[in-house]
Amino acid sequence: MEGLNARLTSPEELLKSFAEDCKLRGMTDESIRRYKSSLRIFLKFLEQKEVSLDSVDMEILRDFLRYLRFERKAKEKTLENYFSALSAFYDYLAFEGLVSSNVILPFRRRYLRRYKNGYDDPERRLLSVEEMSRLVNSIMDPRDKAIAVLLAKTGIRRGELLRIDVDDINWEDYSIMLKPTPKRSNRVVFFDDECAIVLRRWLRVREKLNPKTNALFISYNTLDRLSRNGVWNAIVKYAKRLGFHNPNSPRLEDHFGPHCFRHWFTTWLLRNGMPREYVKELRGDKRREAIDIYHHIDKEELRRAYLACIPKLGV
């Protein structure tokens, strides 16, 4: 890849340096892995075109978009992920003085729906309380039911759920201590009596399987910690069966995956009257304003508010 600053001579060196920069900025290993995967596809595309990184222009980006959209059949959300990785990469190159500017920013504003429409979080599918009740009560498998109910009752991310160990559950006050992550400020989440019922049911089954790992959720095949795809499959097959998930639709609102539980959790707590700052605390959102650092919420008060506002699902 000729034409680029000689300090970094190969695409792999660039990727390695970029990944180190991402880690220094506090990004998760999973986010860095996804960025690198997208960037390797872009770099291979440039290699086939015999184009260097500092020679990329709008026409090359249009060609890459055509390649992703029409040859790889990438969906809109996937396209956004590709160009998010590219934008972060070109930000880094510009910061290091390896390119003159980030050419991705104006391109994605024009061609990608998320940025063209000027919103940051596309509308995800939102189930009613009755629909969520139908979903979780349609799940007979004790592990999958526990996953669905725990996601709905806590609003935690898929990665946070996967890292929960059995010992992280506090049965005295119905809380879970999550593993530390750069994305989260508050590590304690609460659950209610409905969630406790399905968790205990799953733990009885899990105990009979006698896994060596301390992971709360395990694979039936390997008896090891459940994977990201394992959680996805555990949710999507039931949502699809009830008509809540259409894998063939290009619209995000026609899809239902693990992150939709977080959207549901947030929306229904707010609709049930929970103060916004309490919802942010339960979600573990980063404190963005200086005054937030000095605003401490009493844990017991937060727990009472949670129990008053979290919807019942009739499990």
Predicted region positions:
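Basic, Lys/Arg- and aromatic-enriched nucleic-acid-binding interface segment
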Residues: 129-158
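Catalytic-site neighborhood detector that most strongly recognizes the C-terminal catalytic loop/helix
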Residues: 283-308
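Short, charged phosphate-coordinating catalytic segments
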Residues: 151-173
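N-terminal core-binding DNA-recognition domain of tyrosine recombinases/integrases
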Residues: 1-5, 12-119
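DNA breakage-rejoining catalytic core of tyrosine-based enzymes
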Residues: 99-101, 112-133, 183-194, 209-214
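C-terminal secondary-structure termini that scaffold catalytic or DNA-interacting sites
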Residues: 1-3, 309-315
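Short, basic (Lys/Arg/His-rich) helix/loop patches that form interaction surfaces
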Residues: 232-281
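C-terminal catalytic core of Y-nucleophile DNA break-rejoin enzymes
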Residues: 182-201, 213-237
